[in-house]
Structures are given as structure tokens and as C-alpha cells.
Amino acid sequence: MAKTSLKVKAARPQKFKVRAYNRCKLCGRPRAYMRKFGLCRHCFRKLAHEGQIPGIRKASW
């Protein structure tokens, strides 16, 4: 889990645009971020299995 200070730091508007980076809205993880949902892969998978994200289904072919 990300430290609270890092979450707050990422949420503040940056002085320069290139310094901004994405973090998961739930856990604050900076890696494996999915822009479309605003979540990291761990939180996305958890919420998808619980049915909390509308329109998401497990792939089967």
C-alpha cells in the first residue's frame, strides 16, 4: 500500500505537467494503472470479480 503522504503528493496539482503521474484511486499504487477505470490491476480484478464494475466480464473464447 502507498503511504498516505505519497497519495496526497500525487493528488496535488504539479508545478510542471510532466511531473504528474497516475495512481490507483483505491490503494494508491502507481504501477499497472488502467486509465479507463482509474484503478490498478489488483483493485480492478477484485472489483470485477465482485461485479462492481458494470459491463466487465471475464473473457472466454
UniProtKB/Swiss-Prot annotation:
Task: Output the InterPro entries linked to this UniProt entry.
Answer: Ribosomal_uS14, Ribosomal_uS14_bact, Ribosomal_uS14_CS, Ribosomal_uS14_sf
Q: Does the keyword Repeat apply?
A: no
Q: Which GO terms describe its molecular function?
A: rRNA binding; structural constituent of ribosome; zinc ion binding
Listed disulfide bonds for this chain?
A: none
| Keyword terms, alphabetized | Metal-binding, Ribonucleoprotein, Ribosomal protein, RNA-binding, rRNA-binding, Zinc
Give the cofactor note.
Binds 1 zinc ion per subunit.
Q: Which Pfam family, any one of them, does this sequence belong to?
A: Ribosomal_S14
Gene Ontology biological process terms from the UniProt entry = translation
Q: Which SUPFAM superfamilies did the record assign?
A: Glucocorticoid receptor-like (DNA-binding domain)
Query: According to its UniProt record, which cofactors does this protein need?
Result: Zn(2+)
Matching Gene3D superfamilies: 30s Ribosomal Protein S14, Chain N
Q: Which residues form a coiled coil?
A: none
Gene Ontology CC, one term: small ribosomal subunit
Give binding positions for Zn(2+). 24, 27, 40, 43
Q: How does it assemble?
A: Part of the 30S ribosomal subunit. Contacts proteins S3 and S10.
Protein family per UniProt: Belongs to the universal ribosomal protein uS14 family. Zinc-binding uS14 subfamily.
What is the annotated role of this protein in its UniProt record?
Binds 16S rRNA, required for the assembly of 30S particles and may also be responsible for determining the conformation of the 16S rRNA at the A site.
The name of this protein is Small ribosomal subunit protein uS14
Instruction: Tell me which species this is from.
Output: Symbiobacterium thermophilum (strain DSM 24528 / JCM 14929 / IAM 14863 / T)
- Name of the gene encoding the protein in the UniProt record: rpsZ
